[in-house]
């Protein structure tokens, strides 16, 4: 494998693919890795308009447009059967009654101190639309970061942690806070990341720790922290789960979505957890977990499967896990060691990773400098392909690997370039998910149609091609876009697609044909 091939492999695994200008820069893989680490050192939270949804008492409205531009006067609520004369204030209905008391178990779902059950169907519909819009905006803002940010390694690490610490809640503010906690510590020390995520209201709600009290312990949070986040099955006992649950009693959150330790709900008695006895707190449990050698091995194995190969190699994992633990669980140090290893560039680890839907979409946009006019169809493609950001299927996250591919998703994957760049006709009615963030969509609302308005600038690719004769351009572009050698019969198909076209159109046809090959699904 030559240096150029190693560079492309690095950019695909440590980010979302190389741009033509990255290839033209001619950096060695070692220098490119240093640049990736440098560019990803700074934490920048995901912020922007429309990323949150607040529905304070009396501002639920039936017209989606009016909620964004016309607040209701006097904190009242309007309904469709109460039309107001032109220029006159809308006729109000009775304001919603405040919640009598907070009893735990949920974060107010976009309606602070209001009972969701008391909303009218119209009000509930408007709430669902507001929540859905906020999550859609969060997803598109993050996809933009993946496609355009120079902090490629941080974005890829955030995607990894997004699946590792899988969480699904209805509250955009809570989901965004959790996301930014992962973003902040994505390349820092894992103990800091673990504590921050564990004390996020979204995670505490998702894993039921708001109901974990000394009189009635709830084991769900403690069990998942060990099974999915730190140790893996077989490295703790049921007694450890029960004792850890006692240590986490009292961990919750307040109305403002802030972590709150409720001392009166905490079990302050002695506990024995993983061989350690004492008046252990939740923080003590998390710290003690990371003293176990199994924790480093478990975490490094998950990192290896995501960034290197779905089949772990113990000869690679054991020294990485040892160094990871010795470094105090320094994530940036782990990733530098992994991407610097000679075995990372072995043929068995190149072009063997099936791109997730998000990697596929972000990769097309990044490698070709694609500009998108309308990102809404891309959200539908995420879901149709099986990966909607902020909506993992369960606490275990997305299974990945070959699970990304079935007959229907493969068809959409292969047609996606034509849909994006030729506005080809393709409509798919998405299945209704009982756990939808905003449920009860109509079939029309669940139908994805073309219209992203994807613009494919040719100048960077023309510079990459330089003086390459037109007949050889498909092969050269295949070396840039594909991580595995193109088969002769596929190269012939690509060449035929570009025949009898003027140069710009021939280049565009070549690109669409290459992106439509099965080989492009691999990184």
Q: How does the language model describe each region?
A:
Residues 99-104, 108-124, 131, 135-142, ...:
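Active-site substrate-binding loop specific to GH73 endo-beta-N-acetylglucosaminidase modules
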Residues 24-27, 36-37, 147, 182, ...:
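Hydrophobic residues in alpha-helical segments
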Residues 20-176, 181-183:
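N-terminal accessory alpha/beta regions
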Residues 2-3, 8-22, 50, 54, ...:
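Flexible, low-complexity segments enriched for small/polar residues
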Residues 19-26, 170, 194, 241, ...:
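Surface-exposed patches in mature extracellular/periplasmic domains of secreted proteins
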Residues 14-17, 145-146, 164, 168, ...:
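Alpha-helix C-capping/helix-to-loop hinge sites
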Residues 7, 23, 32-33, 241, ...:
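Hydrophobic/aromatic residues in well-formed alpha-helices
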